[in-house]
């Protein structure tokens, strides 16, 4: 399978247009039920005097019925304002269905300082090394007299740092525990915990004159209840509490972030093809809310917010998957 894309922007009064090119090839392999592919992209951005060409090889293998190995490896050549540099990166994931109830994923991601591939809309992340695992366990309840039909548990452990280890180095943990009831209602609990400290990267950005900022331990707890989804009107209640940031003896320097929220919403389902979603309100209150102002400058505010939203889902046709 082949794919090709090319685009040229017109010049404006104030800048020259960009030029894009991309080529994609993908092949199926009979051995290991695998797939391999190749992607190259080229971008010329004369308005900022930058050219970049990326070459990426991706793969997807299934060593067994229950396991899968997939990812990609790539390099990029960049010439910006007369400076030439080359970057490398890769991403690898391995999944295995241990039992019908237990699913496990392992991942390893790496991108060096020069692996800046944001020219064609990729996620901008470089100078990063992350490793972790994800586990999901579903346990059906065979006791028909119980109101609980199934319990669901998921867990994720993540370590993330810069390539040289000067930033990051913290360890974060996520877990999600949910009860599914026989009437199709559900009750779920979630927690994000940063339980090993690291060096903050977002606010310092390797700026030489920036202060050393340590990312402290913290946690955010969330709970959500959904009424039976088989009813024409479903109600959803949710609440959360979190505490992160930096705490000092000086009140003016105290950047400890305390937050809490609660909300209520409805889902109206008059038919199988139409759905109306109304978030009546979500109240949020947060101290020392951090917001990016410009490079290496953040503002901190006490935030209080009430928000509402409305959306409509309409399925055209009668076939749904």
Please annotate each region the language model reported.
Residues 30-32, 62-64, 99, 182:
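Short strand-coil-strand connectors
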Residues 50-52, 68, 72-321:
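Exposed, low-structure sequence patches enriched in small/polar residues
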Residues 1-50, 58:
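A conserved hydrophobic secondary-structure block that centers on an alpha-helix together
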Residues 57-59, 312:
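Intrinsic disorder/low-complexity signal
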Residues 6-8, 27-29, 40-44, 63, ...:
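Short, flexible loop/turn elements at secondary-structure junctions
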